[in-house]
Each structure stands twice: as structure tokens, then as C-alpha cells.
Amino acid sequence: MRTLFLLNPTAGKADCTRTLPQQINVAAARAGIAPEEYTIQVTNHAGHARELANAAAQQARQSGEELRVFTAGGDGTFNEALTGIYGYANAAVGCLPFGSGNDFLRTFGTKEEFLDLDAQLAGGPVSIDLMQTSLGLSATICAAGLDAQVAYGIPKFRRIPLCGGEMAYVLSIVEQLCGHIGRRVEYTIDGETLDVDCLMCAICNGRTYGGGFCAAPEAQPDDGWLDVYIIRKVSRVTIAKLLGMYKSGKHFQNGQLVRAAEPYFIYRRAKQVSLRAADGRGPIVATADGECAPKEQITVQVQPLAGRILLPKPAFERFAAQRTAQSADRT
């Protein structure tokens, strides 16, 4: 088995390449992994993790080996590597959460579990669904509307001197709330057409995005379904109340919207979703696992069990136990 560690020095607030390589060397020795069986590489441009993971997957397949890829960065770095190994049955990707959001792991466990190198090397691979989207492959959530517009606006404010990540985020929110709120959007959800004045929507394989917004608190990443949440257009006063409910995941319990959320949310389960602007105001901004761009039409389709990911030992054991229990319930 080959193991590749991909370190993104620009992810998060601190450069992980300063201390992580030595920690990897120590953990690998404890796990009995010989120096020639693993490689540490540092990414240096956008898309580099995808390129390195793809090259390693090709090489491992040619030599008949299994490949483990661990990304040290955020959701964007993880998604790049996942895209790089897509279609390679011999490869799987795990994440060491050194980014600012790290939403992918929240569906499976805690940040502490995923930072534990010993647990990571003792864990194992599982198969999950992926989403093929207009922004590329996604493991977690594809969102469109107000939240995506905020994310899209952040780089502009980061270019202002002394305006760091948190300040850029706040300024982007203020800009959006001071502008026109809501879009008329036409949705096609497994053949059902909905024409909605909406604030935003989230098409979910995982549970959280945006640094902890629990959009889909009961999503199962290996059930072959997308959980779709549409938030109707509301007043600025109501937005704060809705976003508080949405962030905590309290809008959805026991397989349905809670009563307080019903006037504001639309919920569906689907295999394929597409949406386009129906108000003549140009493209809709969408975001998915680190990618963010305006699109004339956004299409999302589930790819059942198309991804192989690595989970640290505690999360791997929980995941396996849950699936065993579900299989027993079905029989």
C-alpha cells in the first residue's frame, strides 16, 4: 500500500507544513509504515492536489497497489484530491482538517478525531455517494443564493489592506444584506417543477457547509439520495431568525421539517436537481466544496457510492456499526 500526504500551506490561519511533516514521520513509524511506503508533498497552486492525487492513483494502479491520500488543508483541498482519484477503485482520500471550514468531516466525526494521525493511519476506507454538479464533483453540499453570494464576495474584500478573512466575511454579508435580497428561481426536482421566490437553497449529500451551517442534519452520505432544502424569500428581519434555526439544524427533525420551519422551507429528497433564474437578473451564484461561481443553470445529480474516503478509526468503526444496524433493520 502507498500513502500520500498532500499539504496545503495556504489553508487556514497557520502553515501546516512547518510542523506536520515531522508529526507524520513519527506517526508513520509508530504504525509500522516504512519511509519508502509514504510520500509527503506540498501543493503550490490551485488544482495541484488534484494533479498530484491523479498521478499517484495512476501509478498505484499500474503497479497493482492500493493508495491512501491524506489532504492537510480545507474542504477545497480535499475535494481536489477526491476529484483526482475519481474512478480509481484502488484509491481513497482522507482529510486532516487544517482549513477554515472543514465541513466534510462533520458528517462523520469530530475535528479532534480527524487531526489524530494515529487514528487516521489505523482507520479504513468507506464508500459514499458523490454529487456531479455544474461546479464539478462534490462530496458535501451544493448551495445557491444568498450564502453563495456572500462566499463569492469575500475575495474582493480580502484585497483591501488589513482586511482579513473574518472581516472580509462580515463585509460581504453587509454588502449582500444592503442589496436586493432573493431571486425568482425555477427548480426541477426529479421531474417536479417549482417556481419559487427564494433566499437560497442547499442540495445536500453531507450535513454541513459554510463553516458549520447544519443544512441537512439527517443526511446520510451513502443512501443514494440528495436532501434538498429551499428557503423562501423573507424580510431582512426574519432572515436572522431563520439563519439561527438553519445553522443549528433545528429546522428538521425525525425526517420532516419542524412546524416553525414549514412556512419558510421547502424540503424534498431527490436523485437529480436543476435550477435556473426565472427573474431575468442574470446568473445565480453557486458554491460547492470550495468552488464558487455564477451559473446560468445549476444541475446536481447523485452518483451512488462513487467515492472512496478514509475515516479515522473511531469514525470508521461508528460508520461500520451504523451500516450493520441498518442492514439488520431491513431484514
Kindly give the residue locations of the regions a language model identified.
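Gly/Ser/Thr-rich active-site loops/lids in small-molecule metabolic enzymes
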Residues: R158-A168, G211-G212, P217-A240
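Short Gly/Thr/Asp-enriched flexible loops that form oxyanion-binding sites at enzyme active sites
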Residues: T77-A89
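Short N-terminal binding/cap micro-motifs at the start of the first secondary-structure element
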Residues: G12-C16, G210, I309
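Glycine-rich phosphate/pyrophosphate-binding beta-alpha loops
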Residues: A143, D147, A202-A216, E291-C292
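Glycine-rich beta-strand-to-loop/alpha-helix junction loops that act as flexible
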Residues: P9, A72-G74, L96-F98
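Catalytic core of DAGKc-family lipid kinases
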Residues: T43, Y86-I203
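ATP/nucleoside-binding phosphotransfer catalytic cores, i.e., glycine-rich phosphate-binding loops
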Residues: I189, Q220, I230-T331
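ATP/NTP phosphate-donor binding region
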Residues: M1-V69, N79, F316, R323-T331
